[in-house]
Amino acid sequence: MNDKDHFSSPAHITVLLNEAVAGLALKEKGIYIDGTFGRGGHSRLILSRLADNGRLIAIDRDPRAIAEAKTIQDPRFHIEHRSFSDIPRICERLNLVGKVDGILLDLGVSSPQLDEAERGFSFMKDGPLDMRMDTTQGLSASEWLQQVSEQDLAWVLKTFGEERFAKRIAQAIVNYNKQALQHGTEPLSRTLQLAELIANAVPFKDKHKHPATRSFQAIRIFINAELDELESVLKSAVQVLAPQGRLAIISFHSLEDRMVKHFMRKQSKGEDIPKGLPLRDDQIQRTQTLKVIGKAIMPTEQEQQQNPRSRSAVLRVAEKL
């Protein structure tokens, strides 16, 4: 049995399991943060490689992930029901700022979240139109769609889903909910109901992709403020890490990956110094904070066959200077 089999469950195959943990360059006595515990695949593998005085802090905003984490009885392990954007505050409380040897983030929706119809993430299964990572906070997708304007919805679909038919889809959704309000009928409240409405609004179908794919992604990203969360943690990660500490991030769509790639490149190059200034090299204050480690890593063909949901995954790793 390999690590991927041992540290994944039938309900959730951890994507890029060995590659992500290898990217952290684990020290046996190190302090690590798994910012997206999920169902614990990465955390369990990290724990298996730490010495008795190693330490792992895991974070997740999904109550079901927290319940899963609480089954781990290990004095080296600590779970926080928070968002990963809270990493700096957690580290301040635990006196770990500048002491963390590695941070791992596995972005996106986990397989159990997609597979559990009642979570409302899937356009393939009928369930309540929820889409919240943390079901204890904020508006559900259904509630938000009942109050959003057509213009704002089109912007969300275009910006976060890169949906070419954003205006058509937004118009169809807002009109449906307006008519429901006028006639006293139920507004959009089920996943398959929304998926069908989107499919009917789209004039051209992609043979290889469900017409609701981009819209569901966009609504989910907006509802959960996913890109804001990512931007926030990127800004604070360098401060939290110890020198030579690693940042390993797995992203699943181009918006996330562009943000991660741009951040790591910018931090590894530092601020541009205008040419022609009368400064010696030793007078220039270097602003590089990270070193990019290797190239982006994608799942192997074998992993993609075993877990089709891994196809779009990209792992990027950087090290604090």
UniProtKB/Swiss-Prot annotation:
It comes from the Bacteria. One of its GO terms (cellular component) is cytoplasm. It catalyses: cytidine(1402) in 16S rRNA + S-adenosyl-L-methionine = N(4)-methylcytidine(1402) in 16S rRNA + S-adenosyl-L-homocysteine + H(+). Its EC number is 2.1.1.199. It is found in: Cytoplasm. SUPFAM superfamilies: Putative methyltransferase TM0872, insert domain (SSF81799), S-adenosyl-L-methionine-dependent methyltransferases (SSF53335). InterPro entries: RsmH (IPR002903), SAM-dep_MeTrfase_MraW_recog (IPR023397), SAM-dependent_MTases_sf (IPR029063). Keywords: Cytoplasm, Methyltransferase, rRNA processing, S-adenosyl-L-methionine, Transferase. The keyword Cell division does not apply. Belongs to the methyltransferase superfamily. RsmH family. HAMAP family: 16SrRNA_methyltr_H (MF_01007). Specifically methylates the N4 position of cytidine in position 1402 (C1402) of 16S rRNA. This is Ribosomal RNA small subunit methyltransferase H. It comes from Pasteurella multocida (strain Pm70).
